[in-house]
Amino acid sequence: RSPFRSDELGAVVYGIWDYIKNSGKYAADNLTLEWVGSTVGKRESRRFMGPYVLKEKDVEDQTEFPDRVAFGGWSIDIHPAAGMYTQAAGTEDAVPDGVYNIPYRCLYSRNIKNLFLAGRDISVSHVALGTTRVMATCATLGQAVGTAAAYCAQHDLLPNTLYEQAFKDYQQVLLKQDGPIMGLRNQDPLDRAKLATITASHTLSELNTNTPDATNYPLDQDVAFLFPVDPKVHGFDLRLKATAKSQLTIEAYTTGKPQNYIPAALIESFSLPVTPADQ
């Protein structure tokens, strides 16, 4: 974080702003630059080695680690090693189909017995750090490590002995505190939520947008809806309004894994005739 780097980056920021403001190519007459950070924030420096090193393949395969305690969802976003003046592409992105797991073994040192890790120093490869480094993901890591540290203090454990002796119990503690552990079931027999049943007297057939000038969404291109299915969907309604006689094609896809949001496999396809009289 040398003064040169701060001055150089500041010169670039204000140079770009000068161009936006004064080139005449942008509608910026009434715009002002509100704030610029005064400290250089490094996205990557030194990382520790833990019992496991999270790799690019783990992110892309969405590996379901038994010791998962956190998750991420950012793309693998790697910036040019040569810096901002390089003529190479600005970024290299690989986007997983959905969120991925981060194991507990990446969050403590393999050779310093009482050292937890969270944030941008965790045990991941250079490429995997391109996705785990973002703030929302770092927050899940902080919760996992903070809970683990408190658990160790309460039960007189070290990070590695927690993993070896009490990990499942720790996972349940983290889960009960709304820890982001995908696919882990609540095992607490005293949790009343597990004994509850849900009933409904009515169904909602129309959403109030609270917008007086709301209009129908034109289906002049494909539109997708994503909704959870656990364990199955008995049916769904679509409200349509046609201006001409036509055919509406509906396709149903799975996403492959519960946490994904990209169509993976076609389940069924069918068409419905629609006329102006229908609604």
Residue ranges and their predicted role:
Residues 235-241:
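Short edge beta-strand/loop segments characteristic of extracellular beta-sandwich folds
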Residues 1-232, 243-278:
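Flavin (FAD/FMN)-binding glycine-rich loop and adjacent Rossmann-like elements that form
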